[in-house]
């Protein structure tokens, strides 16, 4: 049984296992060897995830193979199940570090094809991480940081996001539909072709955003203070049948914007 992965040389040495090396049979055997191994940490998570992602990358043209990671978070530990065609190939627990703010540190990571599950996801830093084809399925996300993260094809199946930061995040086809967005900072983000349909949006900031072709259909802007889109690019954004009390659209680009208001003060 493998108890620890050598960590000499830091994370860079762990990242050398790339898609050029090995093959699927070798890598699947290696991945399975880590099943249930105790005492794993952040560096081990990066290493094992790279093995998994190498297999996934080799198979990306084979649409009959479905690979993803199911992740749950409890205190300082993340539990990860590595799936291939609905079968768990490996399941491990990883003790993670916390950053200076006391957030679980998932920053600067490749989190492609992760499915985060749980009741509440709180105080997690995804700073500058790569989140492509990621799903968050939980009741609530609070006090999380997605600053400068890549968020392509991310789905938030949550009831509520509160005190969450997306400053300078970038991505397309992000789905927030039917969520309560309470005190969420999207300023300077680039979220194109994204979905805010039927959201309840409170005390949130969209200043300096690039929101090309995003949809706010039947969204409700229910803020104590005005919703701000100052200097945002709203080209081809749909604000159809929205409810809004106070909003600031100063210096916006509004070419091909569609706006119909069901209610306004």
Go through each PLM region and give its residues.
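Non-Sec secretion/translocation targeting segments of pathogen effectors
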Residues: 1-18, 28-30
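Tandem repeat scaffolds
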Residues: 20-26, 30-265
């Amino acid at each position: 049984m493998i108890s620890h992965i050598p960590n000499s040389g830091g994370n860079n040495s762990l990242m050398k296992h790339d898609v050029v090396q090995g093959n699927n049979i070798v890598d699947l055997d290696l991945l399975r060897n880590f099943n249930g191994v105790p005492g794993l940490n952040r560096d081990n998570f990066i290493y094992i995830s790279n093995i998994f992602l190498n297999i996934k990358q080799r198979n990306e043209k084979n649409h009959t193979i479905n690979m993803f990671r199911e992740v749950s978070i409890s205190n300082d530990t993340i539990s990860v199940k590595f799936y291939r065609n609905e079968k768990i190939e490996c399941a491990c627990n990883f003790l993670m570090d916390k950053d200076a703010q006391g957030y679980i540190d998932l920053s600067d990571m490749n989190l492609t094809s992760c499915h985060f599950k749980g009741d509440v996801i709180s105080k997690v830093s995804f700073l500058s991480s790569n989140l492509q084809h990621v799903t968050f399925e939980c009741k609530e996300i609070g006090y999380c940081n997605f600053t400068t993260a890549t968020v392509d094809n991310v789905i938030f199946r949550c009831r509520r996001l509160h005190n969450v930061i997306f400053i300078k995040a970038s991505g397309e086809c992000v789905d927030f539909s039917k969520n309560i967005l309470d005190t969420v900072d999207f300023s300077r983000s680039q979220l194109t072709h994204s979905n805010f349909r039927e959201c309840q949006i409170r005390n949130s900031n969209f200043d300096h955003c690039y929101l090309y072709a995003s949809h706010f259909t039947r969204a409700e802007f229910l803020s104590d203070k005005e919703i701000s889109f100052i200097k945002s690019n709203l080209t081809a954004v749909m604000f159809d049948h929205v409810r809004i009390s106070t909003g600031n659209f100063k210096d916006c680009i509004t070419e091909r914007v569609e706006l119909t208001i069901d209610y306004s003060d």
